[in-house]
Amino acid sequence: MSAVQEALPAVRSSRDATVRRFALTDAIFHATTRAAAILVLVLLGGVAISLFAGSWQALSTFGFSFLTSESWNPVTEKFGALAPIYGTVITSAIAILIAVPLGIGIAIFLTELCPRPLRRPIGMAVELLAGIPSIIYGIWGLFVLAPFLQTTVQPLIISMFHGIPGLNGLFAGPPYGIGLLTSAMILAIMILPFITSITKDVFDTVPSVLKESAYGIGCTTWEVTRRVVIPYTRIGIMGGVMLALGRALGETMAVTFVIGNAHRISTSLFAPATTISATIANEFTEAVGDLYTSSLVALGLILFVITFLILAIARYMLMRIDARTGA
């Protein structure tokens, strides 16, 4: 028997041991990643179940009227979620309307128009805005923005639209400074860095050959941005907007400072109002009685459902866009 034949069993044994070791490592890796994925679903389900269980007393007591009633009276234990829902939706919608054009515009400037020496400082300034705690925004809004709006902007707007049908009610009432519009402006400032950063990052993924080809046939910067950059990155932009909207819907401290915390619905954007998160933050520690606490938990469940529905609608919209464009 040759030396090679004598060494074959040892080689096979070493190879089999290596294969078994790799197989064990691979199995552990698969099990760990699978457990992590399942944990996410378990946590999500646990949050939903705990919110539903905690809100059951309020939901069973008030029924569907909990969603349609504006009343919120802890003394008589009559609770309705319509006013907080209204405030949450209106402030978030206005914030998105303000922040999306600004964020996309800043991203276009940074990627297409900004001189190279200024790109890094401006980009760092945008990222710094994202790192400021929300309570700082709230304090700034209460002591700086709200007084400025009260003494300067709101009286001017009220006088401009006074007597104009349809718009006079939208900007009616005394200039409190705080209210729906102030909260929406604070939210817009807070979510602006998210939209800008994500949009800038997805703009950077556009292949240079596409933009250079468009410039080569005589397209302007506006045409390149509109016809090449934005269509190529639409899904990433939508993702950034949805992330910002989720931040706006759930924001608590900054909104609590400047919204006025009034459980009422007004057509005026200058009127004090409240949101779901602000109501929970203001009243949870003062909730006396099981029904009061259950009503606050029910508000949390409603916010959970609203956020889930918005993300589901966004996903559906992206699927429709992909199907229509063949992406």
From Swiss-Prot:
Subcellular location, principal: membrane
Membrane-spanning residues: 36-56, 89-109, 128-148, 178-198, 235-255, 294-314
Where's it found, cell-wise? Cell inner membrane
Is Transmembrane one of the keywords? Answer: yes
- Give GO BP annotations, semicolon-separated: phosphate ion transport
Q: Which residues form the ABC transmembrane type-1 domain?
A: 85-314
GO CC terms on record? plasma membrane
Gene3D superfamilies (UniProt xref):
MetI-like (1.10.3720.10)
Q: What does this protein do?
A: Part of a binding-protein-dependent transport system for phosphate; probably responsible for the translocation of the substrate across the membrane.
UniProt similarity note = Belongs to the binding-protein-dependent transport system permease family. CysTW subfamily.
Entry protein name: Phosphate transport system permease protein PstC
Q: What is the lineage of its organism?
A: Bacteria, Pseudomonadati, Pseudomonadota, Alphaproteobacteria, Hyphomicrobiales
The record's gene field reads pstC
